[in-house]
Structures are given as structure tokens and as C-alpha cells.
Amino acid sequence: ELEKTIAAAMNEISNSRQGQTSISEFEIPAYSNDGKLKLYELLLRKYSDLINEFEKKTVGEIKSMVDRDNLTVQSLCERFVAGDYSFERNYEAAVSKVLEFISGEIVYVKSDIDLNFWLTPNEILEKMVGDDEDIAVLLCSVLFALGDEKAEVVIAEMDNRTTHALVITEHNGKFFIFDATQKHKINDFSGDKAGVLSRYSFRGSRIKRFLYKFNRNNYEQFM
């Protein structure tokens, strides 16, 4: 319930910054609900330490978030593959569709409140909102369900001193970066690893270094 409340609050704050807030099935101007949004933000800031403590995860728990057996992940995966799906033949085409859906339909929200919590795939798709880490874990889980055991979530330090989550993998001799928080084609960030890492950017910022990466089977920290 705590995670759902936070997600709902972040979703309404995000919508308000785009000019409108959803209340039931009606849309009203953001200023009409300004008090409610301020209260959400105040509560999140006030209880941020408690939330962060509650949301702490062990390495094992972090790895387990990349879950191909999750029913929501499986359902999402099935939307983009045919019955005769082959990892070798059809993987990149399926990823292209998944990437287009997630980047186009799920609203990326970067909270300006110091909160560290993780949404489940079901919560992300219920509210159609998530931060970069939530979205990266969801994408990596779908890639895992498509048969990609090399895909990993990476938390990177950017050259503007922020952090950003993305997904890396290798397929048919090519290195890929997938970032579903921004719209891009599957091959925009693909090729030799050094070239891809130097070419990738998020809102004008480039990767300075990897902090840590993980998937279902591995966790590696670089700090």
C-alpha cells in the first residue's frame, strides 16, 4: 500500500507539471488541486527516511527483481511475440516493439525527493509511470522472458553528476544499450562496446562510469 500511495502521488505530480491532473475520469486544471499535490509532496519529504529504510534491499532481493516468471512480465512479453518465436531469429524485432511500447506509453518520472523505492511490474503498468530504475528493471525482466540471459540493469554515473538506469546486453556479436526512458530505435546504441558507450547520451549527458549492474543471476559493483 505504501508503494502504491507513493506511485499515485508521483503520477499526479508528474501530470500536474504537464498541465493537468486526473481525478477519477475527469481532468481538471492543475491549480485546482494544488493543495492536494503540495500535501503529497510534504508527506513524501517528511517520511522519506522511513520509506528509504523500509525499501532497503539485499543483493539477493535486488537480483530477484529481474523476474521473467512474473505474470505481468509474461503477459507483456506475449503481446510482442508470435507462437513460433525464436530467440536467435526474432529477438531484436521483439525488443524493438517492447522498447517502443515502454518508452511511448509509460511516463518517466525522476523524483526530486530523496526517495529510494522500487515499483513492481504490475504497479508500473497499472499507473503507467515509473522512474528510470523501475523502467530499466521492467525492461530487463521482459528481455529475460524473451530468452536474453545476458541483459543487465546498469546504474550509471553521468557526467553531470546525476545517476541514470539503463539496460545493456549483447546479441549476435553486437553490444546494445536500451534506455526506455527516452525514445530511440533498437540500433541507435548498438555496435562495438566502446563506441556505444561513448555515443550514448541521456538529455545531453554522457556516461562517466558504471556504479553497479545486475540481473537475475549476477550483481557487480564498481564503486
What are these regions (language model features)?
Residues 1-223:
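A structural boundary/capping signal
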